[in-house]
Design a protein with these regions (language model features):
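Short sequence motifs at beta-strands and strand-loop junctions characteristic
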Residues: 52-57, 92-97, 137-143, 174-176
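Repeated loop/turn-to-beta-strand initiation elements of outer-membrane beta-barrel proteins
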Residues: 4, 70-74, 111-114, 151-161
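Surface-exposed loop and membrane-interface regions of Gram-negative outer-membrane beta-barrel proteins
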Residues: 47-52, 74-97
Length: 188
């Protein structure tokens, strides 16, 4: 019985060390964002309105985090960022884009990291459906900057606040996509 207990403790200790030394792990996340210029306003038949913002609203992403040292990590993610009008029966507009982010983080404390990097936004467009179908507007690909802080609630769960500075351009017109956001990250 003693040998089994000792063997179990040794294996548990080795597993803990191995978990701490992992140099690559996956990350999945979800964020709520707000800000940026109003790209479009929809007026419904009942008189209500709804706006599409260049910095809104939901951002989902997945990727990998690479540990470069005890205090530094790099993160590479691909995501989908979207803002959409409510639509109901009148139709709706959607502003969607596909950001690729390359970020570096410095771990200022065991449970907190600060960082930032570049955000490459691809295929940004406004499209429509319902009675609004046919409306479509495409933006040029763009590069922005990200600054963020993340509190690690546990080794696998992070909560972050971030700010993104970016600008969308098309046909000589530009719109600010600057926005802030609150994110949930799951490290696997």
């Amino acid at each position: 019985m003693k040998k089994l207990l000792i063997a179990t403790l040794v294996c548990a200790g080795a597993a803990g060390v191995q978990a701490q030394e992992r140099t690559v792990r996956g990350v999945l996340g979800l964020g709520l964002t707000g800000g940026g210029d109003t790209l479009a306003t929809v007026v419904y038949t009942d008189g209500t309105t709804d706006n599409i913002k260049a910095g809104g609203l939901v951002h989902v992403f997945g990727g990998a985090e690479f540990r470069l040292g005890t205090d530094v990590t790099m993160q590479a993610t691909v995501g989908y960022h979207v803002d959409e009008t409510n639509g109901y029966s009148d139709g709706s507009l959607r502003f969607s884009r596909y950001p690729i982010e390359l970020l570096a983080h410095y771990h200022v404390a065991p449970n907190f990291k600060l960082g930032g990097g570049a955000r490459f936004v691809n295929n940004a467009k406004i499209d429509s459906r319902g009675v609004l179908s046919g409306a479509r507007f495409e933006f040029d690909n763009t590069v922005g900057a990200v600054v963020e802080g993340e509190w690690m609630v546990s080794p696998a769960i992070g909560l972050k606040l971030r700010y993104v500075s970016e600008k969308y351009k098309a046909n000589g017109v530009s719109a600010s996509g600057n926005h802030g956001g609150f994110y949930f990250s799951w490290y696997i």
